[in-house]
């Protein structure tokens, strides 16, 4: 009998890549507990915490401006669907968490889009999800950026262009037209 028929097909893991930036990224203590550029497998039922508490958080962010537990990530499967996703929940009472431009207060949670910017305090985290087909575990890979991930684009305000050549508004009686 052919042995290839008995071999399980290998499933790909969903991978969440988190590129992190902080203005004081040179400070060795800030990201000391995070192994950069290494994928870490995480069981699907695990809740992954980020924050200042080294004993509770799998990914410690050692800054006085970060809450003890800032936020957590959790892998889940949609109801009546085989696709998996990752949700983020703000666990900080003092710091708001922003996912793209959506503000999350304490205990608010949302599903992470495939690519988004997570911000709190001075931290910027670019999150990119590569979907896999395994629902038993997923991977997180952390990268460190030395440049800001948020680009402030200055767009000068444009002056409106009048349709009829006059720069000031002119009132016209509706019967005078």
Swiss-Prot record:
Alphabetized InterPro entries for the sequence: FHA_dom, SMAD_FHA_dom_sf, TIFA
Biological process, per Gene Ontology: cytoplasmic pattern recognition receptor signaling pathway; innate immune response; positive regulation of canonical NF-kappaB signal transduction; protein homooligomerization
Pfam families assigned: FHA (PF00498)
Keyword rRNA-binding: no
Subcellular location, record wording: Cytoplasm
Keyword vocabulary terms for this entry: Cytoplasm, Immunity, Innate immunity
Domain FHA: 48-104
GO cellular component: cytoplasm
PANTHER family: TRAF-INTERACTING PROTEIN WITH FHA DOMAIN-CONTAINING PROTEIN A, TRAF-INTERACTING PROTEIN WITH FHA DOMAIN-CONTAINING PROTEIN A FAMILY MEMBER
Family the entry assigns: Belongs to the TIFA family.
Record's subunit section: Interacts with traf6.
Protein name (database record): TRAF-interacting protein with FHA domain-containing protein A
Gene: tifa
């Amino acid at each position: 009998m052919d042995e290839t028929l008995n071999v399980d097909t290998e499933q790909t893991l969903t991978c969440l890549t988190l590129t992190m930036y902080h203005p004081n990224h040179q400070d060795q203590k800030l990201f000391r507990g995070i192994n950069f550029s290494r994928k870490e497998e995480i069981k699907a039922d695990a809740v992954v915490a980020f924050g200042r508490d080294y004993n509770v958080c799998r990914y410690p962010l050692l800054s006085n401006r970060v809450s003890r537990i800032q936020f957590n990530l959790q892998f889940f499967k949609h109801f009546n669907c085989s696709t998996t996703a990752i949700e983020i929940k703000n666990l900080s009472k003092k710091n708001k968490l922003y996912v793209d431009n959506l503000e999350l207060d304490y205990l608010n949670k949302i599903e992470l889009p495939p690519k988004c910017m997570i911000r709190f305090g001075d931290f910027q985290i670019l999150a990119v999800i590569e979907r896999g087909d395994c629902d038993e575990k997923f991977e997180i890979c952390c990268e460190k950026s030395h440049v800001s991930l948020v680009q402030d684009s200055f767009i000068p305000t444009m002056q409106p262009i009048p349709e009829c050549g006059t720069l000031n508004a002119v009132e016209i009686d509706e019967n005078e037209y």
